[in-house]
C-alpha cells in the first residue's frame, strides 16, 4: 500500500463537474493498492496516517497529528501510484491491484480512518477525477506498508 499524504488548507475532488468530496484544513490522501495488500497493511497505514505528527505547534515544530488538530481527510484512490516508469516511455501498471481487489481495501482504509474519529471525504473509485488542493507548507510525504 502506498499513500501520498499532503497537508492541505483545503481540497476537493470533482467528477463530471460535480464536487463529490471536499474538506477544509487536513490531509489530502492519494491511495494506491498493490496485489500483496491485505487488511493488515490497511490497518497499519490508516493508523500511521491518523497519528502522523505533521502539524506544527506554537514553536513551528511538527508535533500534532490530524487527529490532534481536528482536521479532515480527503481520500482519493489512485492506481497510478504503482506505475513503473523504469522501462520504455509508457508506465506499466502491473503492480497495481485489480479494481475488484483494490476497491474493498480502499473502502476498508476509509472506514478505519473514520473509526479513529476522523471525518473522511472521498473521491469516486475508478472515475476520472479533477483534484484541487491548497498544499499547506508544502508538506508532502509518502507512507508505505
Curated annotation (Swiss-Prot):
User: What highest taxon heads this organism's lineage?
Assistant: Bacteria
GO biological processes: D-amino acid catabolic process
What's in the keyword line of the UniProt record? Cytoplasm, Hydrolase, RNA-binding, tRNA-binding
What GO CC terms are in its UniProt record? cytoplasm
Cite a single Pfam family from the UniProt record: Tyr_Deacylase
Query: Member of which family?
Result: Belongs to the DTD family.
Q: What the protein does?
A: An aminoacyl-tRNA editing enzyme that deacylates mischarged D-aminoacyl-tRNAs. Also deacylates mischarged glycyl-tRNA(Ala), protecting cells against glycine mischarging by AlaRS. Acts via tRNA-based rather than protein-based catalysis; rejects L-amino acids rather than detecting D-amino acids in the active site. By recycling D-aminoacyl-tRNA to D-amino acids and free tRNA molecules, this enzyme counteracts the toxicity associated with the formation of D-aminoacyl-tRNA entities in vivo and helps enforce protein L-homochirality.
Record comment regarding domains: A Gly-cisPro motif from one monomer fits into the active site of the other monomer to allow specific chiral rejection of L-amino acids.
Record's NCBIfam families?
D-aminoacyl-tRNA deacylase
Q: What is the name of the protein in this document?
A: D-aminoacyl-tRNA deacylase
- What is the phylogenetic placement of the source species in the record? Bacteria, Bacillati, Bacillota, Bacilli, Bacillales
Amino acid at each position: 500500500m502506498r499513500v501520498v499524504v499532503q497537508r492541505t488548507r483545503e481540497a476537493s475532488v470533482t467528477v463530471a463537474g460535480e464536487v463529490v468530496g471536499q474538506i477544509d484544513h487536513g490531509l489530502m490522501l492519494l491511495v494506491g493498492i498493490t496485489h500483496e495488500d491485505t487488511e493488515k497493511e490497511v490497518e497499519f497505514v490508516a493508523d500511521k496516517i491518523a497519528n502522523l505528527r505533521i502539524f506544527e505547534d506554537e514553536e513551528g515544530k511538527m508535533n500534532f497529528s490530524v487527529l490532534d488538530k481536528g482536521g479532515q481527510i480527503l481520500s482519493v484512490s489512485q492506481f497510478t501510484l504503482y506505475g513503473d516508469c523504469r522501462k520504455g516511455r509508457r508506465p506499466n501498471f502491473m503492480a497495481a491491484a485489480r479494481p475488484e481487489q483494490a476497491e474493498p481495501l480502499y473502502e476498508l482504509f476509509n472506514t478505519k480512518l473514520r473509526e479513529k474519529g476522523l471525518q473522511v471525504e472521498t473521491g469516486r473509485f475508478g472515475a476520472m477525477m479533477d483534484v484541487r488542493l491548497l498544499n499547506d507548507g508544502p508538506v508532502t510525504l509518502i507512507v508505505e506498508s
